[in-house]
């Protein structure tokens, strides 16, 4: 009841928002007749006029109605397409830092041209962001004629283009590209050697297509640029041979139950646990193979690396399944996106997991990586001055959009009423019964000539259905991560009479399914088609279209409920576009993942008690509610994980912004002479304080130690003891000043020898190189801190507060080390001429080019759990590192938490 009340309130607020925007729509419509009278040249001149008005002090809101009317009129002339009133509403929502929920087929791509044009008038650049390269290229090329007609330039930013092409793309008025590429360019710009190497302008306005996919589904997966670390492929191969010797047991050991297996899997938490028996077995196997000393423990401090490899191998074998979580193609393990079902070439799991999967599959093992730079989408997109997004399904996640990004969601009405028929779920006892019912439904649809889109949650499931259809001689097309090159073509023709298309999750998103097939694609396939050919293709399509509508339109058939209601709604949304006929139904079984993990055994027991015969389905509101509640639980858990990830990443983000801002200032500055002077006083002063404590008596001074340190670290040979012996009036303060002055004099002598301009350039190069090296080490230290921070909860401390405190200490340490190392290098290195600085810069670039950078959109593996384990969910459970006697799985944990060892530090990550 309370939920319904909230929905009602949200709906009324939505109506009020639309009512306010409707007034502007009336203004735009009133301008239409006048704009139709303008010549092409007069219409094009509007762009220059708007820019002049903005320069004179008018705002975007002041010119919005006229700008939208201009785009609408230009679209009529260039595309022969007129923006509907609902598209004008959508455009206004997108201009006002909000998310527009627009149903599939309502013309989101054309809607985006309105705010893109308006915001491009500022000259600061507009980024239109899509989920893949194909959509970015398609939308850019489709809309290019419209924008160029209005005098704007269009750029495309996708993977694989050169630096100059990227610069040109970013300097365009409107840049289309993928979320990953924009994020990686931001990181690359902050690793650049000079201002000329940067490609991005300041982040002004981002318009995100499929915003739910990018800001929610991918929010847990940070973008990481990493370089190869040491080679440990042989160790992965050896450890991999141990795992097949281990036996799984159904449930975890407890006081009441001790199994015969070596490990157990917690499917709900996606974790795997060694049993006490399994732990001993692994240690014995390692000893047999000479990888562990006799009597040594896997959990001793010296064996941390070995434990890491064993954990990774066990997870690879038990939690990651081929053709579900990844595929093997051309000798490489390629991750499959759990949300879209698409493959993600070039991306790798972190923490050694990818190498463990490669060892499992017997393919070439690539080196582990060291993080060079990383950022989450949450923190990247929050840097934009203006942010907006559009999708067909945002309403279910409206709270998260508002809470995390400050974006309100506005549901834009459809241009025509929705007539799709959404039928109740059918639940079967077994998966086999479910698949038989699905095949029967498909056959019935084909007899009527009704096209069917079958949505699956994994590649494995899509291939199983494909095999069943081959057996039943049902012609079909398979669209999954293995064949996404043909994705758009298959989806576009999925609406033909009697067509059967199997699609993994939301593969093909962004391409409309037109009833009767896509006649435009047929025309595009011909070389220079004649008007007669075009007319015939369109006439044939009209016949097919009418036949499909008569058969009931596109039928959506879901083979399993997804964890998120939103993704189920996306599948349903493929039918019923622009008022078309259509229908949808989900087929479920008690063996489905969601039902097995989250629906209780009572549901299955009740179904059996009802005396259901084989092949019989249950269709009841109570069951539907139970499924929806299970989905809500998972959604809430995933939201908590994303929220906690953000809270932790915010700490790192504050530091990242400070470092990147400092780095950019260094690169842009003509000279950093003043900076060097300031830090020189700090560094030399801090070293003196260690040997001559402030306001201390001379007996406490360590003068020989100070002389040695100044000579070793700063090439400063000073007779300090001799000064003190000869000069009775030389006190602590004057001595300090003399030492600092001595360093300054030595540095000035160096400057006179090589020339001021050469030294200034050298200072900048040293500062940047030192900062980059320390930042890389700092990222590794922060990762290490985050992985173990949950343990503070056992000491009655707040892990989040402890993380903030310790990360600040690490950052302070970074800044102090930076100052010290820069002054030390500048003191020691002898620069002879300009060529030395140039050689240093060239060597640095050469070394960087050798680094095989890996661009990951790697899942945040350490971030698991949620729900009741609020703080523990921040990091994977790290096994206790222990020396001495072995702790039993059911013994009290040595950390003092009061919990059993297996439930505390005995958990595997």
Curated annotation (Swiss-Prot):
It catalyses: ATP + H2O + cellular proteinSide 1 = ADP + phosphate + cellular proteinSide 2. Its cofactor is Zn(2+). Gene3D superfamilies: Helical scaffold and wing domains of SecA (1.10.3060.10), P-loop containing nucleotide triphosphate hydrolases (3.40.50.300), SecA, preprotein cross-linking domain (3.90.1440.10). The keyword Ion transport does not apply. Keywords: ATP-binding, Cell inner membrane, Cell membrane, Cytoplasm, Membrane, Metal-binding, Nucleotide-binding, Protein transport, Translocase, Translocation, Transport, Zinc. SUPFAM superfamilies: Helical scaffold and wing domains of SecA, P-loop containing nucleoside triphosphate hydrolases, Pre-protein crosslinking domain of SecA. CDD domains: DEXDc_SecA (cd17928), SF2_C_secA (cd18803). Residues 863-909 are annotated as: Disordered. Zn(2+) binds at residues 893, 895, 904-905. GO terms for molecular function: ATP binding; metal ion binding; protein-exporting ATPase activity. Its EC number is 7.4.2.8. Belongs to the SecA family. Part of the Sec protein translocase complex. Interacts with the SecYEG preprotein conducting channel. Has a central role in coupling the hydrolysis of ATP to the transfer of proteins into and across the cell membrane, serving both as a receptor for the preprotein-SecB complex and as an ATP-driven molecular motor driving the stepwise translocation of polypeptide chains across the membrane. This is Protein translocase subunit SecA. The gene is secA.
């Amino acid at each position: 009841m309370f939920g319904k009340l909230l929905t009602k309130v949200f709906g009324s607020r939505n109506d009020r928002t639309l009512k306010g925007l409707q007034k502007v729509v009336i203004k735009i419509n009133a301008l239409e007749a006048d704009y139709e009278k303008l010549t092409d040249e007069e219409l094009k001149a509007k762009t220059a006029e708007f820019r002049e008005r903005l320069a004179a002090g008018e705002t975007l809101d002041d010119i919005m109605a006229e700008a939208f009317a201009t785009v609408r009129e230009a679209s009529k002339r260039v595309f022969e397409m007129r923006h509907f009133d609902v598209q004008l509403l959508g455009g206004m929502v997108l201009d006002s830092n909000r998310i527009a929920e627009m149903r599939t087929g309502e013309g989101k791509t054309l809607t985006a041209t309105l705010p893109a044009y308006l915001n491009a008038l500022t000259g600061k650049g507009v980024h239109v962001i899509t989920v893949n390269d194909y959509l970015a290229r398609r939308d850019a090329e489709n809309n290019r004629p419209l924008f160029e007609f209005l005098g704007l330039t269009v750029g495309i930013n996708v993977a694989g283009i050169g630096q100059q092409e990227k610069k040109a793309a970013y300097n365009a008025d409107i840049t289309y590209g993928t979320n990953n590429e924009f994020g990686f360019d931001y990181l690359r710009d902050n690793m650049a050697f000079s201002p000329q190497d940067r490609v991005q302008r300041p982040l002004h306005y981002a318009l995100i297509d499929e915003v739910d996919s990018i800001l929610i589904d991918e929010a847990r997966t940070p973008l990481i640029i990493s370089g190869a670390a040491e080679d440990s492929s042989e160790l992965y191969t050896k450890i991999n041979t141990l795992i097949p010797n281990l036996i799984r047991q159904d449930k975890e050991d407890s006081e009441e139950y001790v199994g015969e297996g070596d490990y157990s899997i917690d499917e709900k938490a996606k974790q795997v646990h060694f049993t006490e028996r399994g732990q001993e077995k692994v240690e014995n196997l390692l000893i047999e193979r000479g990888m562990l000393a006799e009597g040594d423990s896997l959990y001793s401090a010296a064996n941390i690396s070995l434990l890491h490899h064993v954990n990774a191998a066990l997870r690879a074998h038990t939690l990651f399944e081929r053709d579900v979580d990844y595929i093997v193609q051309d000798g490489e393990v390629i991750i499959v996106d759990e949300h879209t079902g698409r493959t993600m070439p070039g991306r790798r799991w972190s923490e050694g997991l990818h190498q463990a999967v490669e060892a499992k599959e017997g393919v070439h093992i690539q080196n582990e990586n060291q993080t060079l730079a990383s950022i989450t989408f949450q923190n990247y997109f929050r840097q934009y001055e203006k942010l907006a997004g559009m999708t067909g399904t945002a309403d279910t996640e409206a709270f998260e959009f508002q809470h995390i990004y400050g974006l309100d969601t506005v549901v834009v009405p459809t241009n025509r009423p929705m007539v799709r028929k959404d039928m109740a779920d059918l639940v079967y006892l077994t998966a086999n019964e479910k698949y038989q019912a699905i095949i029967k439904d498909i056959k019935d649809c084909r007899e009527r000539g009704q096209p069917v889109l079958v949505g699956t949650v994994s590649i494995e499931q899509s291939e199983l259905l494909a095999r069943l259809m081959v057996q039943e001689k049902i012609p079909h097309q398979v669209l999954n991560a293995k064949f996404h090159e043909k994705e758009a073509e298959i989806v576009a023709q999925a609406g033909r009479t009697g067509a059967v298309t199997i699609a993994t999750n939301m593969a093909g998103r962004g391409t409309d399914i037109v009833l009767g097939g896509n006649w435009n694609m047929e025309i595009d396939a011909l070389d220079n088609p004649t008007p007669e050919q075009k007319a015939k293709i369109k006439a044939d399509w009209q016949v097919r279209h009418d036949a499909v509508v008569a058969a009931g339109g596109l039928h959506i058939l879901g083979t399993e409920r997804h964890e998120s209601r939103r993704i189920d709604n996306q599948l349903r949304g493929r039918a019923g576009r622009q008022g078309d006929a259509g229908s949808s139904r989900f087929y479920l079984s008690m063996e489905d993942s969601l039902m097995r993990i989250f629906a209780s055994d009572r549901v299955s027991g009740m179904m059996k008690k009802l005396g259901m015969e084989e092949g019989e389905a249950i269709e009841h509101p109570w069951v539907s509610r139970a499924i929806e509640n299970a989905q809500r639980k998972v959604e809430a858990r995933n939201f908590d994980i994303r929220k906690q990830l953000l809270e932790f990443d915010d700490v790192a983000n504050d530091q990242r912004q400070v470092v990147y801002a400092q780095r950019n200032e260094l690169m842009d500055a003509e000279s950093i002479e003043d900076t060097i002077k300031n830090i020189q006083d700090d560094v030399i002063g801090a070293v003196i304080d260690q040997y001559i404590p402030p306001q201390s008596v001379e007996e406490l001074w360590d003068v020989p130690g100070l002389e040695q340190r100044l000579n070793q670290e700063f090439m400063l040979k000073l007779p300090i003891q001799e000064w003190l012996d000869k000069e009775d009036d030389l006190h602590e303060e004057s001595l300090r000043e003399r030492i600092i002055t001595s360093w300054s004099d030595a540095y000035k002598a160096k400057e006179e020898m090589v020339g001021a301009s050469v030294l200034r350039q050298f200072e900048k190069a040293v500062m940047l190189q030192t900062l980059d090296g320390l930042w890389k080490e700092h990222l590794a230290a922060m990762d290490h801190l985050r992985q173990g921070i949950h343990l503070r909860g056992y000491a009655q401390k707040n892990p989040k507060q402890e993380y903030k405190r310790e990360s600040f200490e690490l950052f302070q340490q970074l800044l102090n080390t930076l100052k010290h190392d820069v002054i030390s290098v500048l003191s020691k290195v002898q620069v002879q001429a300009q060529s030395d600085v140039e050689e240093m810069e060239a060597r640095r670039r050469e070394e960087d080019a050798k680094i095989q950078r890996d661009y990951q959109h790697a899942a945040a593996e350490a971030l698991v759990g949620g729900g009741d384990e609020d703080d523990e969910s921040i990091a994977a459970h790290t096994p206790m590192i222990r020396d001495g006697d072995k702790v039993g799985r059911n013994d009290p944990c040595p950390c003092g938490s009061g919990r059993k060892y297996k439930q505390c530090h005995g958990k595997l990550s």
